[in-house]
Curated annotation (Swiss-Prot):
It is a single-pass type I membrane protein. The gene is KIAA2013. Glycans are attached at N363. The keyword Transferase does not apply. It comes from Homo sapiens. This is Uncharacterized protein KIAA2013. Residues 1-40 form the signal peptide. Residues 611-634 are cytoplasmic.
Length: 634
């Protein structure tokens, strides 16, 4: 009875405003205590709520696995050495002869230097499909300094169906895969690359780490694990202990009606990969591609047999050579050659406007252009005589790069690329630009020369007969950037445009000696001061930015001291100004029209004010200024 009476009186109690406020306050305190206690339990490793699985069983496990596997990419991404794939970043790996779109699984081959790329109807890579996957998370990036595309997938697998074990586990070490991968998650890492030193070779490295208690099984889909493409015929080649597939076919006709014969040798891969619990698998699939020159379809029947046999012999010979090499050695050789090739470059430090390309845009453009350019200088089959000739061509002080800098040329440094075809067109545009600006010798050398020309063009550097000059526009020095690895004689020069604490630009120059040291001198605009000898000291040398009238280069670098000393007498300058004085003259202030408009508005305002005062005191019906005492209105 007592409880019933209290419950009947509860609505009356809640009708009071102070009671409702007290209940709200108590509820708020309970919520705060609940959240505080749950946070303490999580910090102590106690009981806590499971993460939201988004409707997929175990979805949180692959995400945690992926986070641990890609943690090392963060620092590389900040330095611009790793670029995640996405819109505006095509998944291209290439070496100047082969170009492969990993995302679309397409292949392009460039038969000759001035011939357009052809696209055979051949699926280049093997696709891996997990059996009974419950959840999956993945990410793919371009490793710019290694010249490859890496894709990481974290798989939560169910029990695979019955089937023979097609590939057993191996003791190969999968670096970076085991750490933090998760006990219930299988980690799959794939590397895709077109070998830099072997233009006809591309490969796919498959690394599978299975830390779970069950067998991991993946289905392989591709030409090496299934039937041959429609446009190709395949034969199984057996030489000793080696087996590989040999595909023969033709490319689609070009716009001119010509066709190319294509032969592909591929390492045979089983239809199903299975990895036992607590083991790892490391498998590398190799391909060798050879293509003929353009052939008229009318004479194709008479030439096809002979051409195909020659291409098959070349592909067979190279594939046998590769199968005798350790796969890790082949991959390491590619990475060393690519790092050597990508040592020069452009580093964007500070950008203060919107029309200057970002560091990501510059690095991606350099990567794509290097990928699309052949590098005969890196070929292992190159003779000593040919190598020496190319080295001399690369070190020849041609008149590259003539004209204004390309820093703000948006068609040469595009912020977004949508497809591999657009990259191939951009490569042709860069070649044409460099050839027309005095860089024919560098373009002839291939990828190292093209990279040298791109770095020179970005900052406005030009070689002359006796010196290297930095002729950037003084009006764009508000951006800070550095040009690395400029080849001069036998040394490499690093040139940076930096800003001091007051925002005034200055030049920093350092030298990296290669081989026998050579004395190199430099002087700033006008060369009025005595030239300074550049050394390989880590601190380098700094030069203030001076601007001459008329405009001349901001810096001269030469091995001939007498030439620089004589140069001051041949420039015939009217004046030499500091950079801030030059900018003050270039920007005299607001235009005349602005000040004329302001003066007109002020004049009109005062005229209007004068008119109001005149009408008030001097116009018709105006009140007198002074009133007498006799005025009755006072």
């Amino acid at each position: 009875m007592w409880l019933q009476q209290r419950l009947k009186g509860l609505p009356g109690l809640l009708s009071s405003s102070w009671a409702r406020r007290l209940l709200c306050l108590l509820g708020l305190l309970l919520l705060l205590l609940w959240f505080g206690g749950s946070g303490a339990r999580r910090a102590a490793g106690g009981l806590h709520l499971l993460p939201w699985s988004r409707g997929e069983p175990g979805a949180a496990e692959p995400s945690a696995c992926l986070e641990a596997a890609t943690r090392a990419w963060r620092g590389l991404r900040e330095r611009g050495e790793v670029v995640p794939l996405g819109p505006g970043v095509p998944a291209l790996v290439a070496n100047g002869f082969l170009a492969l779109d990993v995302a679309a699984n397409r292949l392009w081959v460039t038969p000759g230097e001035r011939e357009p790329a052809v696209a055979p109807d051949f699926v280049p890579f093997v696709q891996l499909r997990p059996l009974s996957a419950l959840a999956e998370a993945g990410e793919a990036v371009l490793l710019l300094r290694e010249g490859l595309l890496r894709r990481v997938r974290c798989l939560q697998l169910g029990s695979p169906g019955p089937g023979p074990v097609a590939a057993g586990p191996g003791p190969a070490s999968v670096s970076g895969l085991a750490a933090g991968s998760g006990r219930d998650c299988v980690l799959l890492q794939e590397d895709f690359l077109a070998h830099r030193g072997r233009p006809h070779v591309y490969l796919q490295r498959i690394q599978l780490n299975n830390p779970t208690e069950r067998v991991a099984a993946l289905q392989t889909v591709g030409p090496t694990a299934g039937p041959a493409p429609k446009a190709f015929t395949s034969t199984l080649e057996k030489v000793g202990d080696h087996q590989f597939l040999l595909y023969s076919g033709r490319s689609p006709p070009t716009p001119t009606g010509l066709v190319h014969l294509v032969v592909v040798a591929a390492k045979k891969l089983v239809n199903r990969l299975q990895v036992a619990p607590k083991t790892q698998l490391d498998e590398t699939v190799l391909w060798v591609v050879h293509v003929s020159g353009p052939i008229n379809p009318q004479v194709l029947k008479s030439k096809a047999a002979k051409e195909l046999k020659a291409l098959q012999d070349l592909a067979r010979k190279e594939m046998l050579e590769l199968l005798d090499m350790p796969a890790a050695e082949l991959l390491q050789d590619h990475q060393l050659l690519w790092a050597q090739l990508f040592s020069p470059g452009v580093e964007m430090k500070k950008i203060t406007d919107t029309h200057t390309p970002s560091g990501l845009t510059v690095n991606l453009t350099l990567y794509y252009m290097l990928s699309c350019s052949p590098a005969p200088l890196l070929s292992p089959s190159l003779s000593h005589r040919e190598r020496d000739q190319m080295e001399s061509t690369l070190n020849y002080e041609d008149h590259c790069f003539s004209g204004h800098a390309t820093m703000h040329a948006e068609n040469l440094w595009p912020g977004r690329l949508s497809s591999v075809q657009q990259i191939l067109q951009l490569s042709d545009l860069w070649r044409l630009t460099l050839q027309k600006r005095g860089c024919k010798g560098l373009v002839k050398v291939g990828a190292p020369g093209i990279l040298q020309g791109m770095v020179l063009s970005f900052g406005g550097l030009q070689f002359t007969e006796n010196h290297l000059q930095f002729q950037a526009d003084p009006d764009v020095l508000h951006n800070s950037y550095a040009l690395h690895g400029i080849r001069y004689k036998n040394d490499h020069i690093n040139l940076a445009v930096l800003a001091d604490a007051e925002g005034k630009p200055y030049l920093h120059v350092s030298v990296e000696s290669r081989g026998q040291p050579v004395k190199i001198y430099a002087c700033k605009a006008g060369c009025l001061d005595e030239p300074v000898e550049l050394t390989s000291a880590p601190t380098g040398h700094t030069f203030s930015v001076m601007v001459t009238q008329p405009i001349t280069p901001l810096l001269y670098i030469s091995t001939d001291l007498t030439h620089l000393q004589d140069l001051r007498h041949t420039l015939h300058l009217k004046a030499i100004l500091a950079h801030d004085e030059h900018m003050a003259q270039q920007d005299p202030g607001l235009p005349f029209l602005f000040w004329f408009s302001v003066a007109s508005l002020i004049t009109l305002f005062h005229l209007f004010l004068f008119k109001l005062i005149y009408n008030e005191y001097c116009g018709p019906g105006a009140k007198p200024l002074f009133r007498s005492k006799e005025d009755p209105s006072v």
